[in-house]
A protein has these predicted regions:
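Catalytic pocket-lining loop regions of alpha/beta-barrel enzymes
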Residues: 10-11, 24-133
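Mid-to-C-terminal alpha-helical segments outside catalytic/metal-binding sites
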Residues: 127-133, 141-173
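Short, acidic/polar
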Residues: 1-4, 90
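Ankyrin-repeat helical core positions
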Residues: 4-5, 65
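Conserved, mostly hydrophobic/aromatic
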Residues: 3-4, 12, 38, 105, ...
Length: 173
């Protein structure tokens, strides 16, 4: 965290894959410090999501509730699996946006149906278009496949420009 103010640092990465849990009281002081540092330096906090255990959206979603009023929170992998995708695209992602939370996401590792469904939900609800960005999770991801699915889902118009360029620029430039 002491390097957070160095030139070129744009984000802090947070994962619970190796231990800890957002709702563990012993973790809360550390989380407070991480998010306070991010706020002080205007950094995004990347939060890794995956199905089940401590990285499940039901756990890491608390970070959005607690901190995304003042810090941009990037939920990597849009919930990390089918259950997370359904919970987020079904309403939670949009509920957070409506509540004023600074929540962003990418669709790396997204299950095949999600990009199209999410694009339709964004269109239907009229919000969220500026909260989704392209990411490929290289070297583990499928760049060509993820790019193609997202390009097809966004249709190459304004939503595509935001997803592939403008939202990233807003967060990280």
């Amino acid at each position: 965290l002491r390097l957070a103010g160095e030139p070129g640092v744009k984000a802090l990465k947070l994962s619970f894959l190796l231990g800890g849990r957002p709702t563990d009281p012993a973790c809360r002081p550390h989380l407070d410090r991480i998010f306070a540092t991010a706020a002080r330096h205007h950094l995004v906090v990347h939060v890794h999501t995956s199905p089940g255990a401590a990285s499940d959206i039901d756990e890491v979603g608390h970070l959005v509730d607690w901190y995304a009023d003042r810090v941009a929170v990037h939920l990597v992998h849009f919930g990390g699996g089918m259950s997370g995708h359904i919970k987020l695209a079904g309403s939670r992602f949009f509920d957070w946006i409506t509540a004023g939370k600074r929540v962003y996401t990418d669709l790396s590792w997204a299950i095949g149906f999600l990009p199209h469904w999410l694009a339709r939900e964004i269109e239907h609800r009229g919000i969220g278009h500026d909260r989704v960005l392209f990411a490929s999770d290289q070297p583990w991801g499928d760049f060509a496949g993820e790019y193609a699915r997202l390009a097809a889902a966004t249709g190459g118009g304004e939503l595509g420009d935001l997803v592939f360029r403008d939202t990233f620029a807003t967060l990280y430039d």
